[in-house]
Amino acid sequence: MKGYAEEKGVTLCMEITNSKVAADQRTDQVFDRLAWGLGVCRAVNSPRVKLVYDVYHVQIADGDVTRNLRENIDRVCHIHVAGVPSRQEIDGTQELNYPFIARTIADLGFTGFVAHEHRPGPGRDPVKSLEQCFEIMNV
């Protein structure tokens, strides 16, 4: 696959998830630790094989979200964000400081996509919730 991706100029993106939360739903999980995915990237040694850096999953499985991002940004093709622990909004009701994470991403010069896995909390207006998430990430 590496050769084909390189020939066609496409990037294969592997998403790291975690096997701690809802482990019964992830019985076939392969990429459940950041180190494992980074090891695959190093072993394959191609600029066309990278990681989807899912902030929610990295926090649950490994922690050190911004340090890990800084140390491995060259292996990241796409970033997912979601609140921890709820997997909902990325606002102040969650344990992560998303304005700081957003500034870190910008400071690293990341030019890929950052996607919010948007799932409003109970009773939240979906549009207002999404607007708030955009304001948080727009640095």
Segments (PLM) and residue ranges:
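Histidine-acidic metal/acid-base catalytic patches
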Residues: 7, 31-53, 57-139
